[in-house]
Amino acid sequence: MQEIIQSFFKERSLVNHQIASYDDCIPAGDNMISRMEKIIRNIRVGIDGEVDDDDGGFIKLDVVDQDIVIRMKNIQLGEPTIREANGSEHPSTPMECRLRKLTYMSPVTIDFQIVRNGVPSPKEEGVQVGSMPIMVRSKRCNLHPAHIAGDRQLYPTTSAEDSDSWKDLLKKKGEDPLDPGGYFIINGTERVLISTEDLAPNRVTVEINKRYAKRTEVAKIFSQKDGMRKPLTVEKRRDGMLMVKISTAGTTPIPVVLLMRALGIDNDQEIFTAIAGPTETFKYIVANINEVNDNEEYAVQNMLEAHEWLQKKFAAGQQKDYREARVDQLLDRELLPHLGDQGTDRKKKAVFLGRIVRQVLEMAMHSKEPNDKDHYANKRVRLAGDLIEDLFRVSSNQLARDLKYQLERHHNRKRELRITSCLRPDVLTSKIMHALATGNWVGGRSGVSQLLDRTTYLAALSHMRRVTSPLVRSQPHFEARDLHPTHWGRLCPNETPEGQNCGLVKNAAQMIDVSEYISEQDVRNQLDELDVYQPDDWSDGDRVHVNGDIYGIHKRGTNLVRHFKSARRRGTIPPEVSIRYDSENRDIFINTDKGRIL
């Protein structure tokens, strides 16, 4: 056992999950299509339609005489440097930043190109857009084995000689070889990002809502794509009506049957088949179909009538083109965007919606219990990389809007348009620095960044492995504070503070590993080889879900699960990929997302 533990920690430190998450976020090493690069390529300012992101982010200027577009991509992080008062620069070390009350950070550069009336101008490469604080011991840190010895790469985990050389070099730079890193240095102070629990996205949870002495069955899902969350709620009312609420589209409830018609299922039999569960639920499905068909409030029997009803509810009094565009936006971008945002994905959304409704009806018939919200399969841990990703997404969009404004001013004053003369690097830097220095994060959260506890070595390690819950401390939340069986081997049962934080502030167990994002496409290619296909009839086999998205079906789900697990044991599929088979509902769930404690 001792050998196993030693080999585990020889490969990874006690704060490896924080460093690995940060490395996955930044463009460093072999991680060229990083999360930050994806954010830059997904920037859309001044346009609502779809644009091919292979050419990078898109900024369209609001000028009358020309069609001017800015494309941006290829974000890079330089080495951490210090700029002196005389303008000179030199590589920095964490110890120098501590002693001089400076921030340990690197310059951020992006390639820009101005396109006038479809004619591209010469690229402006390596334009500095700001600075990014660097995590100590990350791949971009000057103390990393890839950088500390100059051009020579050290391999301290596999070579004893390199390990000794690395430790000697660390001592020369004033660093403790036993310090694991995993924190930032902001204005000379060491600050750590606290991991937070979050509900798993793209996962359906059913619960009973008891409000005003009324019991209603509710299903909820947080559909997430490219960092944007679109909550959706399906509720069975006391009169038996099944209603959908799309939070981003207002409070207007939509009958499930009407919404399924709008998504392209005209046939009553198809709607019935998509929802049908136990025989006790049949009467509710038929009643809902009849209500939408016959009730004067709805009177919707086909897709065209369903679209007209939605137009009256969500774009009343507007021009026809606007009404149609608003409904298309509702169905494609605001309704379950993780399943796709194209018109061709609507049938799949209708099938997924039917599955959600079936779960609500099964719970209403008491054949199923509500989901356990405290089960750790329903949670994800947001690490340093995820928190930096959220912050960088907001900061880069703010930078793009400011650049658009400055370019429009220059154009209106008949000046030459150059990115370097219009871009203000302090917009990005100040936004990121303020959040890390104060702990006030995007989304209204506070206390995300904290001063690292250096009371003892163990106190520092404990602080960097802390996991907090976003729940309000002043409320009881008895079940959330209790130990749960799924905490076994993942969270420490003893280390939690006394007082109002008890049970809401936890610490990771010693040998946990937290999953990083694994490419869905690699898993989908494996599924194609295992005879998973996209059908015309989604009820013709076992549905295969990849990160909540219905990818296809398979005729024999048990065989697929067996072959998938066999491929995972052989190393063809990464060990972090999980698979679960729900034989009762004929669903196979595969997860490759980040934040799962393994």
Residue ranges of model-derived segments:
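Conserved helicase core region in the C-terminal RecA-like lobe
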Residues: 491-498, 505
